[in-house]
Amino acid sequence: MEFLVKSVRPETLKTATLVLAVGEGRKLGASAKAVDDATGGAIGAVLKRGDLAGKVGQTLLLQNLPNLKAERVLLVGAGKERELGDRQYRKLASAVLSTLKGLAGADAVLALGDLAVKGRDAHAKARLLVETLADGLYVFDRYKSQKAEPLKLKKLTLLADKADSAAVEQGSKEAQAIANGMALTRDLGNLPPNVCHPTFLGEQAKALAKEFKGLKVEVHDEQKLRELGMGSFLAVAQGSEQPPRLIVLQYNGAKKDQAPHVLVGKGITFDTGGISLKPGLGMDEMKFDMCGAASVFGTFRAVLELQLPINLVGLLACAENMPSGGATRPGDIVTTMSGQTVEILNTDAEGRLVLCDALTYAERFKPQSVVDIATLTGACIVALGSNTSGLMGNNEALVRQLLKAGEFADDRAWQLPLFDEYQEQLDSPFADIANIGGPKAGTITAGCFLSRFAKKYHWAHLDIAGTAWISGGKDKGATGRPVPLLTQYLLERAK
């Protein structure tokens, strides 16, 4: 889809569809009023008949209005004045896209710039709008013999006042990069586990480096992990015929001596639970257990497209967790790259076992910050549901930066505590630490486990178990989150 920004009067534009907003009580904004005047009050007459109440997301398509070059006018409800928030604005945008998809027109003009969205300026409104539209165009039909019908719509133009046009252009540019990153994240997450395994992800990293010349990639194999002393990482993979991979992505968009930010992604390409086997019902969704790594891929793609002046490292800890005669047993003790020993009480708490070695590996980059992203605990879904990611960290300023980025990106997280009292739940009589802390506060104790391997830098942990994918039903699939949050965090660091 091509997105353009223009500063012209809406009633003068030749287009297949002109989109205008109407508030409750027949409220017309400046753009809708100008078009109404040009048509001799045709829009007002339709509204007077009561065909559109103006509630958020309601639509009404008008054909062949007089004195317009637009073939159609699509009216969309914007709700009550001064009550339009992010959620309602997204609903409005989705309703517009849904209608446009069903039309024969190849282009549309969106005259929505005069809509007031609470707490959002022209840049933020444009970004939210374009991101919603672009993400709404996503289709995954790679394995369907009956493909989706090609979309006739090819171009969307946003109208903006001349004073706002630069801000709208920038918002649109950022949104397109984020949406492209989300699409990559969703593609990787939606792929079946017989295709998307650790070796495949290594190949995808190299493919991304061919597409964007600023990206450097290293793929560490099983032998290299053994040389590095990553006993915990290797323990997760030893039950599978698929070999593990530690994928290292590096992008240097700033001065060489500037310390990088590091993103660490959990990449369990399929999680059976290992010997601590999961229930069979819903196990197919454990292909999404690599969505942390997929979100690092997607964030890198967004950063590379935007060419941000920042140094960034990605560490993707990729393995498959399977039961077999060679699999790790409950009670096994392994030595991590840090030298700490771990008693593995539950082989289904494997994400932290690959992440802990990746977090130790991150030390060599002397980073400004490290953020790990993982579908780590079902307890996070119990605590926060599927709307909000869990967030913990050892540096309050970093946590606040991530919370702020999530609020701006409408990809929110919520902070959970890492009090010392929780650490006691991880005590082991046989090793330095146990990999689970009992039934209580499971998300927090998982964060506590990781914190023991992140003491040499500012670190935060995002638990995306509830937000990385939609479970069951017709909308089942990866969401692309938290690419918007992470990209916004890096945009702010790049200023």
From Swiss-Prot:
The reaction(s) this protein catalyses: Release of an N-terminal amino acid, Xaa-|-Yaa-, in which Xaa is preferably Leu, but may be other amino acids including Pro although not Arg or Lys, and Yaa may be Pro. Amino acid amides and methyl esters are also readily hydrolyzed, but rates on arylamides are exceedingly low; Release of an N-terminal amino acid, preferentially leucine, but not glutamic or aspartic acids
Primary location recorded for the protein, binned into one broad class: cytoplasm
InterPro entries: Leucine_aapep/pepB, Macro_dom-like, Peptidase_M17_C, Peptidase_M17_leu_NH2_pept, Peptidase_M17_N
EC number: 3.4.11.1, 3.4.11.10
Residues annotated to bind Mn(2+) 1: 271, 348, 350
Cofactor, how bound (note): Binds 2 manganese ions per subunit.
Keyword Protease in annotation: yes
Active-site residue numbers: 278, 352
S-S pairs: none
One Gene Ontology term from the biological process aspect of the record: proteolysis
Protein function: Presumably involved in the processing and regular turnover of intracellular proteins. Catalyzes the removal of unsubstituted N-terminal amino acids from various peptides.
Protein name: Probable cytosol aminopeptidase
Source organism (scientific name): Pseudomonas paraeruginosa (strain DSM 24068 / PA7) (Pseudomonas aeruginosa (strain PA7))
Lineage, opening ranks: Bacteria, Pseudomonadati, Pseudomonadota, Gammaproteobacteria, Pseudomonadales
Chain's gene name: pepA
